[in-house]
């Protein structure tokens, strides 16, 4: 049997709409991500379990893990009879790369089970394709960090899909999922078709400056540049309490605060454990809307998807 864990990820990381992503894992060792296991069987089957199993499609063929198996078999030219189990620990429509977790774990599990017929680049291309079936467009800002780990900048040139961006060892990422769903398609539809030249210039300055600050290890400059002029101004209306949370983050002393992916999860970057704990407490009391919500203090997950068994 092969079992793969794929971690949660932050799409966009505020400053890099559709081109920047970061994998995260809780500091307390909690597995914030999906697991997929594969074992030999006479015919294909898929079993679902985990905290958020009730949110999965009723028809197994609509399940993205079934589609991963089907597409992987097409890619290698062979129908592989296996029993797959999806452990759905990630809320759907959360802004934590939930579908990417399932896609990455599903495809990597099949590839490991079949003795790696596909290389990492071929796998990543399939992952982007499958993720696009869920979100409506092919983009790699969740699947690349989820698969490869750390923070990744999407390039998609010269057969290079993404490149790693250095993070900061003392940064703690406080992740808060309020317990409500925001559809990625809806969150994309709310964005304008065109932007003003001034906004594009600011976006380029923030993103270029952020990448430079990461490579030159200037954490305060990097945090200052984590500003979103593309999506956040329009998506805040989909996120009850986000404006108050952003203000609280500033008051508490967080370095930056933004929307994770298309929301409703938000993240706050802190460089002191005490600040991170106070931020987590505030979010637990004021940002969560029901008992499905949660708050985790995380670090960048530099390992990415990995075998658990």
Curated annotation (Swiss-Prot):
GO molecular function, one term: homoserine kinase activity
Keyword Protein biosynthesis among record annotations: no
Binding site for ATP: 91-101
Role description: Catalyzes the ATP-dependent phosphorylation of L-homoserine to L-homoserine phosphate.
Family listed: Belongs to the GHMP kinase family. Homoserine kinase subfamily.
NCBIfam families in UniProt: PRK01212.1-4, thrB
Protein's name in the database: Homoserine kinase
Species the sequence originates in: Erwinia tasmaniensis (strain DSM 17950 / CFBP 7177 / CIP 109463 / NCPPB 4357 / Et1/99)
């Amino acid at each position: 049997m092969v079992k793969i864990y794929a971690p949660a990820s932050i799409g966009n990381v505020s400053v890099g709409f559709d081109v920047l992503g970061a994998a995260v894992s809780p500091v307390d060792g909690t597995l914030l991500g999906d697991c997929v296991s594969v074992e030999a069987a006479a015919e294909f089957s898929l079993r679902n379990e985990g905290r958020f199993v009730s949110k999965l499609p009723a028809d197994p063929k609509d399940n993205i893990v079934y589609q991963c198996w089907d597409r992987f078999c097409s890619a290698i030219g062979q129908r592989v009879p296996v029993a797959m189990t999806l452990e759905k620990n990630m809320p759907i429509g959360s802004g934590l790369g939930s579908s990417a977790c399932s896609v990455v774990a599903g495809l990597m599990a099949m590839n490991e089970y079949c003795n790696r017929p596909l290389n990492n680049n071929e796998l990543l291309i399939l992952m982007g394709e499958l993720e696009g079936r869920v979100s409506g467009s092919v983009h790699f800002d969740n699947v690349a960090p989820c698969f490869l780990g750390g923070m990744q900048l999407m390039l998609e040139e010269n057969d290079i899909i993404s490149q790693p961006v250095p993070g900061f060892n003392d940064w703690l990422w406080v992740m808060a999922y309020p317990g409500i769903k925001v559809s990625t398609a809806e969150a994309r539809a709310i964005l304008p078709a065109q932007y003003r030249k001034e906004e594009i210039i600011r976006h380029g300055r923030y993103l270029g400056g952020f990448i430079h600050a990461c490579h030159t290890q200037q954490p305060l400059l990097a945090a200052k540049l984590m500003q979103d002029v593309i999506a956040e101004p329009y998506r805040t209306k989909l996120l009850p309490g986000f404006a108050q949370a952003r203000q609280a983050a500033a008051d508490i002393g967080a370095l930056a605060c933004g929307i994770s992916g298309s929301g409703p999860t938000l993240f706050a970057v802190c460089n002191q454990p005490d600040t991170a704990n106070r931020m987590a407490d505030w979010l637990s009391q004021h940002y969560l809307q029901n008992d499905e919500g949660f708050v985790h203090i995380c670090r960048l997950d530099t390992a990415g998807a990995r075998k658990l068994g």
